[in-house]
Amino acid sequence: SLFFKKKSPLKRGDEVIVPSISWSTSYFPLIQYGLKLRFVDVDKNTINCSADNINRACTKKTKLILAVSILGNPVELKKLKSFCKQKKIYLMEDNCESTGAKHYNQFTGTFGIVNTFSTFYSHHISTIEGGVILTNDYEIYNLMLSLRSHGWTRDMKDNFYLKKNQ
């Protein structure tokens, strides 16, 4: 959805920081959009990337960090969010394995501009397939409504996106 914003913050060739341990569905959509993945090693005790290692891995081409909290063990999201704000890098959460987990009294899956949850049969909440996306960005919200409905805009309030682009 970040690609479809009016002022797209991502371009083909931009760099995304990702953990070396995740699921293929975390990586493939990023590759399909032409983004370059920069893998960061995880700590063997937490199975997560440390915020410091992620910080060191960032370059001038880094535009997005995909934080993945593994097995209910949150990444250092508070540090990452602060770092991202300072460096003007987008933070996105893959929270498919940590529904209900908290980091400093805040639920995981609420720190990023886009936050994903899976309802695949092996996850915390199962609908056999599917998922949930959370965002507090109004434009992304409306884009998601459109994507969910194969491009139909009838659910968008006042045809939000059409009016903005005319």
Give the residues covered by each predicted segment.
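Active-site region of PLP-dependent enzymes
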Residues: 98-104, 111-166
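Conserved coil-to-alpha-helix start sites within the AMP-binding
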Residues: 21-27
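Phosphate-binding glycine-rich loop
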Residues: 1-15, 29-33, 39-41
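Aromatic/hydrophobic pocket-lining residues that form π-stacking "cages" and hydrophobic walls in ligand
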Residues: 26, 80, 144
